[in-house]
């Protein structure tokens, strides 16, 4: 909601909808855990105090807010791609959810933008390497040492498809 700061929107969304912990959000945003906890509490209080209603934005507002939504989807994916806490190095369920959310956005003509397509391509390319990113001992494997035969070719093809769609425009964005 636009009456809440951008950072607070990110924090609320990652916490409430993404299910991330305050620690994970602080790592994601490169901020102190205490600062994130306070910002989360303030944003929740503001939401309740002002009785903010969540309504579907107008077409003009969708365009303005899409960049923030894509950033949140990216941050959710990023936390899954390299988990900041817990035993798992990769949390595939977060990555799958980020991809699902991005695909839902693309179903809307207003959200089917080069940025949204480029972000989905990026997520598919990264997801294609899951099977090669962790070795038998559970350690992270750098890109240069990954067994490329373990890369998921179908996900690479999906990535190429969305990269092609993103490239139909000359617009430069954060994900291409």
Q: Where do the PLM segments sit?
A:
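Alpha-helical residues within the helix-turn-helix
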Residues: 27-29
């Amino acid at each position: 909601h636009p009456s809440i700061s951008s950072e607070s929107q990110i924090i609320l969304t990652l916490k409430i909808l993404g299910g991330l912990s305050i620690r994970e959000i602080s790592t994601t945003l490169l901020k102190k855990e205490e600062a994130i906890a306070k910002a989360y509490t303030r944003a929740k209080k503001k939401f309740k105090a002002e009785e903010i209603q969540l309504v579907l934005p107008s077409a003009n507002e969708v365009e303005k807010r899409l960049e923030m939504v894509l950033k949140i989807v990216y941050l959710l994916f990023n936390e899954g791609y390299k988990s900041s806490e817990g035993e798992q190095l990769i949390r595939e369920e977060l990555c799958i959810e980020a991809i699902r959310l991005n695909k839902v956005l693309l179903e809307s003509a207003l959200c089917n933008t080069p940025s949204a397509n480029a972000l989905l391509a990026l997520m598919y390319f990264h997801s294609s390497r899951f099977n090669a990113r962790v070795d038998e001992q559970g350690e992270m494997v750098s890109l240069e040492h990954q067994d490329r035969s373990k890369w998921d070719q179908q996900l690479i093809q999906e990535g190429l498809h969305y990269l092609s769609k993103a490239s139909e425009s000359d617009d430069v964005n954060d994900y291409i």
